[in-house]
A protein has these predicted regions:
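C-terminal helical cap
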Residues: 141-144, 162-179, 225
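A conserved C-terminal secondary-structure "cap"
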Residues: 218, 224-225
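N-terminal hydrophobic targeting/anchoring segments and the immediately downstream early-domain regions
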Residues: 1, 6-19
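Shared catalytic-loop signature of beta/alpha-barrel
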Residues: 199, 206, 212-213
Length: 225
């Protein structure tokens, strides 16, 4: 994601490191695309099958460069048989004091509004009408947007799936709400299931937590006839 935000304070440093690691000179967007392809080839050779994007929002207009790069990456993922995950909705680093004291990704993030729903549909439609959709999994952080994401996934099924309850929603109430949304607007059989942050070994129990909630819900439905 750092390569999709040229306005980010650390963008120049990140681009320099990408150029160094790939051996590709990055002087324009074509150079950036080439470097990203080289990096993708490396990850694919190491067995990578999933890519993940965490974005505050998805909209057109001022974000045309980012959209162009996302569309390009989506096509590359499809060509390589990789899954494209879109985690949408957080607003980052809200407290200047906390950011200055402990840095990024340290508790200063909050729930935001993802996007104009039409922008999300427009993005997926562009991918579909271009080279074709890769497999896409959508995750919303704002629970008020669950119906937007679940119905959008149905629009582009089976390539697009509605992902598991994420972050602040990864709770008893949040997981139940996500499952209800999935069953009401789509099919439970189309669930992508639970996922785990591989960087955090303490997150692995969430699979058991999810399984118990899912089994309790199914048992209640069966018991109720």
């Amino acid at each position: 994601d750092r390569y999709l935000e040229p306005e980010h304070p650390g963008a120049r440093k990140h681009l320099s490191r990408l150029a160094e690691s790939t051996g590709v000179a990055i002087a324009d967007i074509d150079g950036l695309k080439h470097a990203l392809c080289v990096a993708l080839d490396h990850f694919q050779a190491c067995g990578c099958v999933v890519a993940d994007h965490g974005l505050s929002c998805l909209r057109g207009g001022a974000d045309e460069v980012r959209e162009q790069l996302l569309l390009f990456l989506g096509e590359e993922y499809r060509r390589r048989g990789m899954v494209m995950q879109l985690h949408l909705g957080p607003i980052r680093d809200q407290s200047p004091r906390l950011l200055e004291t402990v840095g990024h990704d340290a508790g200063g993030d909050s729930v935001g509004a993802t996007s104009d729903p039409a922008a999300l549909g427009h993005f997926l439609a562009k991918l579909e009408s271009g080279g074709g959709l890769p497999r896409v999994i959508l995750y919303n952080l704002n629970p008020a947007e669950s119906a937007v994401f679940s119905t959008m996934a149905v629009n582009f099924a089976p390539q697009v799936q509605y992902g598991a309850a994420w972050w602040f929603n990864d709770t008893l109430r949040g997981i139940n709400a996500q499952l209800d949304e999935l069953m009401e607007t789509g099919l439970l059989a189309h669930s992508a299931g639970m996922l785990t942050d591989s960087r955090s070994f303490t997150s692995f129990p969430r699979h058991e937590y999810y399984r118990r909630i899912l089994c309790a819900k199914l048992g209640k439905l069966v018991d109720g006839g």
